[in-house]
Amino acid sequence: MGASKAPDAPRVLVIDDDDDLRTLVVRVVKQAGYGVDSAADGQAGLDRLAERTYDVIVCDVRMPGMDGVTFYREVERRDPAAARRVVFMTTHVRSEECRDFLWGVHAPVLNKLFTLDEFRSTLAQIVGPRR
């Protein structure tokens, strides 16, 4: 899924296996003035990253197939600068390993009960506010 925005508009990649949430987040990103693409899992996200550069990557932690942790580690291996632009979404962290991972990468983490203002603020922290 793509969006037509001004060529200089920051680009956001949204990765989440929940179709409804992914669609909602894509809509919010577009309304905030960003260009946006989406993917339903980590592997599809990596495929998108091979095609273009993104200013922000919003990624679910728990997904079937390639989860967010594995996705992040692969992005970090391929392009450490891109890994610093990842924002994670999660309902809650269940395993100690996942908690340790999120704590260790120092990436922003949005609870999936986030408000639209929290989401927009997190994007703006990474790429700056949109006019």
Predicted ranges, named:
Residues 112:
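A Lys-centered signature of the CheY-like receiver
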Residues 23-31:
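Charged docking surfaces used in two-component/phosphorelay signaling
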Residues 33-40, 48:
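Short hydrophobic/Thr-rich beta-strand motif most characteristic of the beta2 strand and flanking loop
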Residues 1-11, 115-131:
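Non-catalytic signal-transmission and effector/linker regions of two-component phosphorelay proteins
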Residues 40-44, 67-73:
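Acidic catalytic/metal-coordinating carboxylates
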Residues 63:
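Receiver (REC) domain active-site loop signature in two-component systems and cognate sites
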Residues 89-90:
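Hydrophobic/aromatic residues positioned on beta-strands within the core alpha/beta folds
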Residues 60:
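Active-site residues of response regulator receiver
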